[in-house]
């Protein structure tokens, strides 16, 4: 197989990721409902998240983040930032990756800004990137099925989960968050 043909096969997932936002774009009302349902689902699956959510200065919720890869990979999703449980701004998350990866999956992502300062820096940015503009401490499940609490003192805490609860082997590193306008 020639290099251009191989390259085009590797770029197909990237094209799908770039096209997906127009396909999955939800109205403001639809997205607000999905955000609310996602937050409820997290609290049902992970009871320890309830107290963290109550203490958070802001909550960034992405109900559905689509990830796909075939050599090159990427992810995208739409969500909103809640302050006092009210949507104040809508966002898109995107990431690109290179490496051995084939397939796709959907997950939900919730980012908790535990301090006013962390929330303010996020809101003032134009294209905030995890691992560059701030670090998101990913919450995982420990040996006994309980949330690993060693990351709970971080100013920004994140959850990545599916229908069965928290997901493993995933990360926020390289994810970029962009403000979007919703009608």
Question: What is the predicted role of each segment?
Answer:
Residues 25-183:
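Small-residue-enriched, tightly packed secondary-structure blocks
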Residues 8-18:
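Bacterial N-terminal signal peptides
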Residues 1-5:
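N-terminal secretory signal peptides that target proteins for export/translocation
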Residues 20-22:
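N-terminal signal peptide c-region/cleavage motif recognized by signal peptidases
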């Amino acid at each position: 197989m020639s290099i251009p043909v191989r390259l085009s096969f590797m770029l197909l997932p990237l094209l799908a990721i770039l096209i997906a936002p127009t396909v999955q774009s939800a109205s403001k009302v639809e997205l607000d409902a999905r955000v609310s349902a996602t937050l409820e689902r997290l609290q049902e699956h992970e009871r320890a998240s309830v107290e963290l959510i109550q203490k958070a200065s802001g909550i960034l919720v992405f109900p559905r983040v689509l990830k796909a890869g075939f050599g090159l990979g990427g992810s995208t999703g739409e969500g909103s930032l809640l302050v006092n449980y009210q949507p104040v701004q809508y966002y898109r998350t995107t990431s690109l990756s290179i490496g051995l990866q084939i397939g796709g999956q959907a997950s939900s992502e919730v980012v908790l800004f535990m301090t006013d300062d962390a929330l303010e820096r996020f809101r003032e940015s134009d294209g905030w990137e995890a691992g560059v503009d701030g670090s998101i401490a990913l919450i995982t499940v420990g040996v006994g099925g309980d949330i690993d609490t060693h990351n709970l003192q971080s100013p920004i805490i994140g959850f990545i989960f599916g229908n069965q609860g928290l997901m493993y082997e995933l990360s926020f590193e390289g994810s970029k968050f962009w403000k979007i306008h919703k009608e």
